[in-house]
Every structure is written in C-alpha cells, then in structure tokens.
UniProtKB/Swiss-Prot annotation:
Subcellular location: Cell membrane
Family according to the record: Belongs to the ATPase A chain family.
InterPro entries the UniProt entry points to: ATP_synth_F0_asu, ATP_synth_F0_asu_AS, ATP_synth_F0_asu_bact/mt, F0_ATP_A_sf
Function: Key component of the proton channel; it plays a direct role in the translocation of protons across the membrane.
Species, as recorded: Parafrankia sp. (strain EAN1pec)
Protein name: ATP synthase subunit a
Signal sequence range: none
Length: 295
C-alpha cells in the first residue's frame, strides 16, 4: 500500500492523493552560499538508479567474451536493441557513435520510471520535473554540439533558421523565429514535459485506486474495494507498459534530433520523419554478430 506520506481517510471520509506525495520530506539539508541543498527520498532514488544502471552495465561488459552468456548476453541484447532499432534506424550508420549514450539514456529513464511500482520505493523519480528537465537539457546540448561540429556554427544556425532558402524574404522572416523557438526551446521543453506529465499522472491515478481499495475493503461496501484493488493491479501493469513506452519515445526523439543536426536540413525534421514513432521506419543493417563485433 502507499506510503504514510499520502493522506488517508480516518472518520471523515476518503481522502485521495495530493501533489504533496511528490514532495518528500528532506532528510537533511545545507546551504552553500545563496544555494540551498537538500537530500530526500527522491534524491536517494535518483542516486540509486544512476548507480544501479551504471553498475549493471559495467558488470555486463567488464569481462566481455566472444560468445556472450548470462548478464553479458542480457546487456548486449539491450544494447543491440537501442543500436539497431533506434540509433541506426533513426540516425543511420553514423548512429553507432551515439549508441552508448542512447543506451544509457534508455536504461536510466526506464529504471527511473519503474521505481513507481517497486515496493518500498513507490516513487517514479521522473515524476519530478527537475529530472526530465536535466535529461532533456543534456540531449539538447548534445544534438546542438553535434550540429555545430558537423557543419560549423554559421551553417548550422542558418539551416535551422532558414529551412527553405529559396522561399521569399517575408517567409524567411516569419519562419526564422518560429524555427528558433521550435528547435532551441520547444524541443527540450516537450521532451521534459511529456515524460514528467505521463509519469506524474500515471502515478496519481494508480494511487487513487490503491487508496480507494485500502479505504473501502474494511467497509460494508468492500466489493467496491475489491474492484478498486483489481483496478490498481491492472493499472500497475498498464503503468509498466507506459514506463517502457516513455523511455523509448524519449530515446527515439533524442536520436531524431541528433540525426537532424547531422543532416542539418531543417534542424531535425528530416530525421524525425524517419523515426519509428513518426510512422516510417528505415531499413537498418541487422547483423546477428553485432554484439560479437563490438566485443
């Protein structure tokens, strides 16, 4: 059942979850000049996820053998999925360069999301906007740096602001600020908000039914409590599916933006058109020995 931080019902009726469940109490805090630092359950879970993902992948690849087995085989399966189905499928052959980052990104977001249904934890760290914003900022920084290194700052920003060089001047004047806002502001913002909103709303909905079952089961209307409990179980399974989907979408869009920066045709729309979530998949060289070649 949900943690004690959730307001429960006593004799005054049922109380559903409030946004306070996403604001855990600080375990300790300190000031560093004008900046306040605090450490709480969210901080601990975020640190745990980072150490878990890093340690898991390190253990899987630290003693790689020609024929992968056990943990190495599992880790390479994850890497191959991201490398072939996301990096190369969206970016192209050059996507291999970004496969390590995309793999870590996918695994980190996935484990962070799954924290919502792990006993004791029961808190998706991506349901706090700070973490999705940081992840989006890192992806934003990478695809812009890639574009600048690939084409030079002048060409990259010119192609971004003027995606249609043959268009009339007044069209260019209208498009330039729109393209700037779209690439430099809207992309990282939508990456962060999409992930945050899905995890926040999903966890709130799950809490409603879990709290409803906890409140109704001891009552004469216990049948409704059973229904609420079954809904909580069903929503847990549904949330697991959403956890995977949101990690996949975030990673695919990051790959699409990197691919767009490499092609520098409209700053990313070209690559986005070829991403699986835009309904068009390109062929990618799939080799059964892909993991062996890297090992």
């Amino acid at each position: 059942m949900p943690s004690g931080s959730v307001l429960m019902a006593a004799d005054d009726g049922f109380h559903g979850p409030t946004p306070d469940v996403f604001k855990p109490k600080s375990w300790f805090e300190f000031d560093l000049g004008p900046i306040d630092f605090y450490f709480n359950k969210w901080s601990a879970l975020t640190l745990f996820v980072a150490l878990f993902v890093g340690g898991f992948l390190w253990l899987g690849f630290r003693k790689a053998t020609l024929v992968p087995r056990g943990l190495q085989n599992f880790c390479e399966s994850i890497y191959d999925f991201v490398d072939l189905q996301i990096a190369q499928n969206v970016i192209g052959e050059r996507g291999r360069t970004f496969s390590p980052y995309l793999t870590i990104l996918f695994c980190f977001i996935l484990v962070s999301n799954v924290m919502a249904v792990i006993p004791v934890a029961q808190f998706p760290t991506t349901s706090r906007i700070a973490l999705p914003m940081i992840l989006a900022a890192v992806s934003w920084f990478i695809f812009n740096i890639v574009g600048i290194r690939e084409h030079g700052a002048g060409t990259y920003f010119k192609d971004m602001l003027v995606p249609a060089p043959t268009a009339p001047l007044f069209v260019k004047v209208i498009l330039a600020p729109i393209e700037f806002v779209s690439t430099m502001i809207a992309r990282p913002a939508t990456l962060a908000i999409r992930l945050f909103a899905n995890m926040f709303a999903g966890h709130m909905l799950l809490l409603v039914f879990a709290l409803g079952a906890d409140y109704l089961l001891p009552k004469p209307q216990f049948v409704f409590g059973l229904v609420s409990g079954l809904m909580a179980i069903a929503l847990t399974l549904f949330e697991l599916m959403i956890d995977v989907l949101q990690a996949y979408i975030f990673t695919v869009l990051t790959a699409a933006y990197i691919g767009g920066a490499i092609s520098s045709h409209g700053g990313g729309d070209h690559a986005a058109d070829h991403s699986p979530i835009h309904g068009h998949e390109t062929s990618a060289p799939v080799t059964a020995a892909g993991a062996v070649a890297r090992a």
